[in-house]
Amino acid sequence: MSLLKMEYNLYAELKKMTCGQPLSLFNEDGDFVEVEPGSSFKFLIPKGFYASPSVKTSLVFETLTTTDNKITSINPTNAPKLYPLQRKVVSEVVSNMRKMIESKRPLYITLHLACGFGKTITTCYLMATHGRKTVICVPNKMLIHQWKTQVEAVGLEHKISIDGVSSLLKELKTQSPDVLIVVSRHLTNDAFCKYINKHYDLFILDESHTYNLMNNTAVTRFLAYYPPMMCYFLTATPRPANRIYCNSIINIAKLSDLKKTIYAVDSFFEPYSTDNIRHMVKRLDGPSNKYHIYTEKLLSVDEPRNQLILNTLVEEFKSGTINRILVITKLREHMVLFYKRLLDLFGPEVVFIGDAQNRRTPDMVKSIKELNRFIFVSTLFYSGTGLDIPSLDSLFICSAVINNMQIEQLLGRVCRETELLDRTVYVFPNTSIKEIKYMIGNFMQRIISLSVDKLGFKQKSYRKHQESDPTSVCTTSSREERVLNRIFNSQNR
């Protein structure tokens, strides 16, 4: 740990990384506070901040020669086979670490790799290469299985802990597995933090963007007070301020042969309203809608829009255009609505629900990976990050209020490299609730723009359903309204 006065140059360097956010650190009294320029307090500067050679310091950090926490079950013949681009990442990491060791810098690296790159298998290769006892920390239980599969493939002795950390500590008194796979809430236990700081050299923080290290979280406190010897942050969408805790980044672009298409399913609805909708509309401008809760609630009861989503999905699925579908909503009740209606149409052998409240969901996810055709309905919270179903070929985004980081993570669910190259995303930029019409259009345009500009999708208009089904809910009141709607859509592309 390094307690330092907040001199101007140090403050400026740290503040620059927050990209306008408040800079918060632990002070000498152990309080997590916002750092003000010229403060007389001393602050705990994260070890990982010094990983970058651009940060000038006279501090000297421990090297791996000071510990003996080596993996005992390692077998070089079990090392996973990597693609050329993954091998390039390994080469970059090894080269950077040599330089860090020579200059006595902390061995902290952020692997900023695109969704579908294969971060898990690449990191397992690095883990086996280092030969050091490792803790893999994941934000939720859903990510455990993909790590378990890869760690077992490498042949490393491991222990998984997703429930009580107290029972894990008792087990660690008699055994010390080479690899611990834990959920991040374990880091709320100081005794556990002290144990892994002493007995494990490598710490892997998976999906590091899910943690805001400018907040006083368990992960923030662990990295500040119990900094590991080596550390990897894994993410496809780095959170800029987190760089303060891991200030060395490797980013290698992934060239892809995938054919990625995003369809904006345009339609014009007659205004739709109910007593419930009118009641929620009154709350749109109030403090209760600060995070657009009521915006999403209104979408969940927008019956014409919901029917359009179902009609589009059913037609595409029945035609065989798409086969392995992920349907994403923001709210649980919206998820349940789609699940029940699709279940009535296709049955339980095809339709599955990714419900965070059901403990069997992770096992169900494993079981559908080998299916040729399925529809998986879930929420953004549960399946937007880290969902491990590589065979997904299509995504229906039913919600609207999604930030850029969530958008990129969500689209990444259908960008995994497989033998099948076609990937399709469907968004629905219109609503029958006039009070949120333009708001939804703007949010949807952000999704489309990011997918095209950053992730290589090609945008196309989807009109097949409206043209082929005269009884569809996508009705127009007049020819003039249809023309005006097309003009509005063209202006917002």
Curated annotation (Swiss-Prot):
Query: What is this protein's function?
Result: DNA helicase which seems to act as a postreplicative transcription termination factor. Involved in ATP-dependent release of nascent RNA. Forms a stable complex with single-stranded DNA, and to a lesser extent RNA.
Subunit organization: Interacts with G2. Might be part of a transcription complex composed at least of G2, A18, and H5.
GO cellular component terms listed in the entry, alphabetical order: virion component
Domain (Helicase ATP-binding): give its ranges: 100-256
Q: Which residues bind ATP?
A: L113, A114, C115, G116, F117, G118, K119, T120
* UniProt-recorded Gene Ontology molecular function terms: ATP binding; DNA binding; helicase activity; hydrolase activity
| InterPro entries recorded | Helicase/UvrB_N, Helicase_ATP-bd, Helicase_Restrict-Modif_Enz, P-loop_NTPase
- Keyword terms, alphabetized: ATP-binding, DNA-binding, Helicase, Hydrolase, Late protein, Nucleotide-binding, Transcription, Virion
* EC number(s) from the headed UniProt entry: 3.6.4.-
Q: Which species does this protein come from?
A: Vaccinia virus (strain Tian Tan)
Residue numbers covered by motif DESH box: 206-209
Q: Which family would the database say this protein is a member of?
A: Belongs to the helicase family. Poxviruses subfamily.
Location comes to: Virion
| Top EC group | hydrolase
Annotated protein name in UniProt: Transcript termination protein A18
Pfam families from the entry? Answer: ResIII (PF04851)
